[in-house]
Each structure stands twice: as structure tokens, then as C-alpha cells.
């Protein structure tokens, strides 16, 4: 991906999320989101590198002063990052222009290898195999279609991989991140020019209002 792609990203990960990734404290699904985003976003990648550097200084300082570190120290959590996710996804070597390499490793290939499951109104999803602390899925929304109006019981991160969507006054294109929490109620609408594919991670179920969306939710496990 070229530098124009990097510079086009306008909606980034929060510092708290990046710090969590650097320390190894994020659930696997959220770590997948960070790894995927920084593969596209030079801004967040640089910020993460600065946090990692600070963590390295902390480690060096503790070694120099012979200060004992706790079992949940930065040293241990950084080791978790190096070890990778618990289910050990198969590395992918597919040249795919939609799925970042971290997602390809979970899919076992490129976009053509995604095992989509229809959940209603033209929307499809593919749940990715992550730990139970949070869920990760690829979501396919037809061009011009709207996701049902919903709220949140926890944190939802959505990153656009193909196409774009509009939410209130904000517009999210490839690489952009939308963060939604328990105070947010919204109805994302896919851009009419192209089908929208997103990576979505959740640490709690969504709250749908209508009867049909609630029925869909049972099948979608969202």
C-alpha cells in the first residue's frame, strides 16, 4: 500500500488502545484490530513504536536498578505479543488488496477464502477464531445498505477494508476506525458506490431496537 493510502486515513485508534497493545493487555480480537490497522496506518504505527520505545526504557531502567518486576510486568506482556494469539493462525502468503496480512492469517488466505454466512438483508459475516474475551468478525454490507439502528453494551471498533460507510456526519473509508461505546446509538450506511467490507471487534453484545434486527442478532451472535 502506498503513502497516499496511509495519509488518507483520518480516523485512528485511541492512545489507550495502542498502549494496551504495546503492553499486551488487549483481548486477542482487539490485538488483531490494532495489528491490521497499523499495517495500513503510518500515523498509528509511529505512535505505537514510541510507546514500545518507552516500554523498552522502563525495562532497561528496572534491570539497571535491580528492581524486581511483578508477574504482570511489561516484560511479560511484551512476551505475549511476540508469542502471538493462542489459536496460532496459519500464516498466509496471499497477495490480497482488501485483507491486511494479520487478517489473512486468521482467514487462512485472501478475500476469496472468506467463509461468509448470510445474516439478513444482504449482510454477510465471517466470525474469526479468537479468544472468548472479545469477538472479531468480517462484515459485508451491500452498497447503499444500512445496518440496523443499534446501541452498545461495551466497546465496538470497526475498520473499513473495502468501500466506505457514513455514520451521522462522519465518513469512514479504507483504514479508518470508528469507535463506539455504550453512549453511542447509530445507523451506519454503506457508500452507494461499492460494497463495504469491515473488520468489527466487540467486547459485549450490541443492543438492537426492532424485532427483525433482534431476530438477526440471534443468528449473527452480535
Regions found by a protein language model. Give the residues of each.
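Ligand-binding loop in jelly-roll beta-barrel domains
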Residues: 184-208
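Positively biased amphipathic helices and basic secretion/translocation or surface-docking motifs
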Residues: 1-14, 28-30, 39-42, 46, ...
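Short acidic-glycine-tyrosine-enriched beta hairpin
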Residues: 167-186
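Short Cys/His-rich Zn2+-coordinating modules
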Residues: 19-28
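Short beta-strand His + acidic residue motifs that chelate non-heme Fe in jelly-roll/DSBH
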Residues: 48, 147-149, 168, 186-192
Amino acid at each position: 500500500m502506498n503513502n497516499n493510502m496511509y495519509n488518507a486515513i483520518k480516523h485512528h485508534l485511541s492512545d489507550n488502545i495502542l498502549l494496551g497493545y504495546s503492553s499486551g493487555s488487549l483481548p486477542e480480537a482487539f490485538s488483531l484490530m490494532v495489528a491490521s490497522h497499523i499495517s495500513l496506518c503510518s500515523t498509528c504505527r509511529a505512535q505505537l513504536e514510541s510507546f514500545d520505545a518507552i516500554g523498552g526504557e522502563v525495562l532497561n531502567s528496572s534491570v539497571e536498578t535491580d528492581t524486581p518486576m511483578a508477574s504482570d510486568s511489561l516484560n511479560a506482556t511484551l512476551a505475549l505479543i511476540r508469542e502471538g494469539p493462542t489459536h496460532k493462525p496459519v500464516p498466509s502468503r496471499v497477495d490480497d488488496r482488501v485483507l491486511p496480512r494479520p487478517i489473512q492469517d486468521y482467514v487462512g488466505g485472501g478475500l476469496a477464502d472468506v467463509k461468509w454466512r448470510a445474516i439478513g438483508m444482504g449482510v454477510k459475516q465471517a466470525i474469526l477464531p479468537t479468544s472468548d474475551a472479545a469477538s472479531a468478525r468480517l462484515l459485508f454490507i451491500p452498497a447503499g445498505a444500512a445496518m440496523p439502528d443499534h446501541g452498545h453494551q461495551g466497546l465496538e471498533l470497526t475498520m473499513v477494508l473495502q468501500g466506505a460507510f457514513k455514520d451521522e456526519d462522519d465518513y469512514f473509508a479504507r483504514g479508518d476506525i470508528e469507535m463506539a461505546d455504550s453512549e453511542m446509538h447509530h445507523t451506519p450506511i454503506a457508500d452507494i458506490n461499492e460494497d463495504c467490507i469491515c473488520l468489527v471487534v466487540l467486547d459485549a453484545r450490541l443492543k438492537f431496537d426492532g424485532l427483525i434486527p433482534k431476530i438477526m442478532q440471534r443468528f449473527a451472535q452480535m
